[in-house]
Structures are given as structure tokens and as C-alpha cells.
Amino acid sequence: MQFSRTALRLLFPVLLTLCAILPLGSLQAAGYRTANFIIEAPTEQLARRIGDAAEQYRHDLAIEWVGQPLPRWSRPCPITAQVAPTLGAGGATSFVFDRGEVFNWTMTIQGSEERVLDSVLPHEITHTIFASHFRQPLPRWADEGACTTVEHPVERARQHRMLIEFLRTGRGIAFPEMFAMREYPADVLPLYSQGYSLARYLIERGGRRRYVAFVGDGLASDNWAVALGQHYGINDLGRLQTVWLDWVKHGCPAPPAAIAAALPSPQAWSPTARGQSPDPTASQHPPRPQRLATTAGRQSIYAMQAQRTQRQLPDTSTADSGIIRR
């Protein structure tokens, strides 16, 4: 079919308008499916890389955290990825808890290809592992803090620098308040940094499975001081706050081997990590959606131009006054 020059001149503005109003991602999006994920990304190659990495993280991190791989979900989790070199890294994972089951997974991730693959994706996958294992919302510090420990060292170092700044400026969160948080506070960035630091402190002293057992016992009893004493030999949240602050002030040193050896012997830990409910529509009760609204906080964190030089740690008086927020 041949077009006259007049027809081409008439069509050209229409094509320009379509290109302007359609999102670039919709023109380039490609898909890839694995056993547990359906990925939409700018290119087929990138979708494949994200999908394969998601499955690998799901397998390996579940073993590290709960002792065995997760069963296959009855329905795959859609992952929508926006990837560009200058795009701030971030992610959000949504799912529904209902009568002890979890389903309706949805995940969005964004950032540079490097940060998506080495930080955002493992962070969000860890959220799904915890949701599958605990089947209920966790305190925000315990969830976000643990998920941040699997990110790239560059991102973890950034969180530490931000923590020091928050402690200096009085934006720290008292531990009794932080342990009670089931929702994100208005000032969310200190929660991420402080939660990561405390999770790191505990994991370095007992490993990831002890951390999971501690969180599980705290959820079951709603007595975090008792759970803390059972797993870490510290029987008070105020005491934990004090020893953690001292650790931060001394540069977060790795614990000697004797520390782990002296921890209380754990009770039998169940590695059970159930999968997704095979038929969520069978429930007779309306599901309660639980969204892990990580996007706002993480985008703000990673979009910041963090200084690459390590700041000095706070002195005792600054840190002590900064952490307590009444």
C-alpha cells in the first residue's frame, strides 16, 4: 500500500501524539514466567534475569532464614520492574492474610539494573518469605530491618550513615515504642535505619534462624522482653537499647565467638514454612489485605545523594539523648 505525501504529513502528528501519551514502559515491556513469578520488565533479557534471580533468592534465602525452601505458590507473584540507570531504587510487596493463609502476591520494583538485582529484589523476596512463614504482620522494625540485611553492602553502609545522623539529631526511636510499631510512622526513615542496625546486631550474635525464632516467640507471646531473654540473654528492652547503643558508638564490632557460645540454648525450632493457600476464595471470611508499603521510604532513601565519606560516630551523650523520644 502506498501513501501520498499529504497522508503521511497528516499521520505524522498523530504518531507523535501517541508516543507522547503512551508510557515508554508500555512500548517496551516484555514478559517472562517462572514457577513462582510473572515478570514484566523493559526487555525480555532483563525480565529473564529478574525472574531467575527471584527464584534463586526465594530458594536460598528461605533456607537461610527458616531452614528449608518455600513450597511452590499456587498462583505466581506478578513482578513489575521499572529499570533505568538514574531511577531511584525502591520496591513494594502486597499480599493478603486470611485465616492463617497468605495469598494475592503483587510486587513492584524499580531502580538501576544493578540495585534492582542486588538489593531491591532480595529485600522484597525476604518480605514474602516472612509472610509465608509467620502468616501475620510483624513489627515494622523486625521486618524491614531483617530485609535490609540482605541488601548490597553499599546500601547497608548508607543505612548506617543515616542512622548516625538520626541519632545525632534526636530522631532515634525508643525501643519500647519501636517494638510496638505495626504500622509505618510518619518519620519512616529512622525506622529503616534503626531497624536494620538492631536486626544486624541480633543476627550477628545468633544467626538468622535464631532471629526468626525470636520474632516468632515474640509474636506468639506478645512479650518481647521474655522472648529476648530466651534467645539473647537480655531480659529488658531498655537494657537491649543500652547495649545496642554502646555497640553503635564503638563502631559496630563483630562479636567474639564466645558471645554466640554463651547464648541460651534454643528450644526446638520448627523450619515449617507453609506456602500460599491453594484456594483463597474458599474462605468464609473477608480477607484482610496487608500491604508492605516500602516504596515511599525506600525511594526517599535511595534517591538521596549520600556522602561517601564515613562520618564519626556519636559520643555517648549525643547518642543517649538522641535515641530516647518520649
Task: Map each language-model feature to its residues.
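Non-catalytic terminal regions of proteins
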Residues: P264-R326
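A generic structural signal for well-ordered alpha-helical segments enriched in polar/charged residues
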Residues: L22, H59-I63, D246
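N-terminal secretory signal peptides that target proteins for export/translocation
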Residues: M1-L8
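Bacterial N-terminal signal peptides
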Residues: L10-P23
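Active-site-flanking segments in enzyme catalytic domains
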Residues: T128, G145, E165-R168, S300, ...
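Juxtacatalytic substrate-recognition/specificity segment
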Residues: Q28-P139, M181, W224-A227
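Hydrophobic helix-coil surface modules that form long, contiguous segments used
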Residues: Q28-A41, R239, P253, Q267-A273, ...
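Acidic/His/Gly-enriched intrinsically disordered linker/tail segments
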Residues: S94-N104, R115-V116, H133-T281
